[in-house]
A protein has these predicted regions:
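Short, well-ordered alpha-helical packing segments
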Residues: 7-8, 22-26
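Elongated amphipathic alpha-helical scaffolds of membrane-associated proteins involved in membrane
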Residues: 4, 29-36
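Short, structured protein-protein interaction patches enriched in aromatics and acidic/basic residues
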Residues: 44, 48-49
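Soluble non-transmembrane domains of integral membrane proteins
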Residues: 16, 20, 27-28, 37, ...
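Hydrophobic alpha-helical transmembrane signal-anchor segments
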Residues: 1-13
Length: 191
């Protein structure tokens, strides 16, 4: 007869070793991935009224505050290829993948800025930004490229959308023309 605690300990030990083995296998691949974007971010300046109490007196002031308006693409097409593979470590096995993503998106100038309480004159269109989210950037592969109107943009790490905890990559662009924006992109992820 085997004591119940010995069985419990054996199961716990194997689970711990399995978790450690999976971490070892996927160390160079990146973990589970959440991918988002592209999202176009338009910064703007808003006048915000603030009231604070100083020595029992209410004081109201108007402060200029920088905010961000997130614009989703009006149309988007995405193509993804995924090549799964099994990697092993001792008696443990884990599935990893290598993926390639490409797509196009079209952004139109937001027509309802007034409804969103955004003054069109306060939009800093010359500081617009495209953001792509990759939750575990260790898995990003070389060769990422983002083009607007056929011109490649300089990519920067980080500053992804909130859905990926700010992880990912981004690119600044000038949208002062306020004409439809054609974006093409491609990048690869391992996970």
């Amino acid at each position: 007869m085997v004591p119940l605690m010995a069985v419990y300990w054996l199961v716990y030990d194997r689970e711990s070793q399995s978790t450690a083995a999976q971490a070892q296998i996927t160390a160079g691949w990146g973990g589970a991935q959440v991918l988002t974007g592209p999202v176009l971010v338009l910064p703007y300046v808003a006048n915000v009224t603030r009231t604070e109490t100083i020595n029992g007196q209410d004081r109201t002031s108007v402060v200029r505050e920088r905010r961000e308006l997130f614009v989703a693409p009006s149309t988007q097409r995405i193509e993804t290829t995924i090549a799964p593979d099994r990697k092993g470590y001792a008696i443990y096995e884990s599935v990893v993948y290598d993926s390639a993503m490409s797509g196009t998106a079209r952004f139109d100038w937001p027509a309802e800025l007034a409804r969103l309480d955004v003054d069109p004159a306060s939009v800093l269109a010359d500081q617009a930004q495209l953001r792509f989210g990759v939750s575990d950037p260790r898995g990003l592969k070389d060769g990422a490229r983002v083009e607007v109107g056929g011109t490649a943009l300089a990519l920067q790490p980080g500053n992804g959308p909130a859905a990926t905890g700010g992880a990912g990559f981004s690119a600044f662009l000038d949208w002062t023309a306020r004409q439809p924006l054609a974006v093409a992109w491609r990048y690869g992820v391992r996970g």
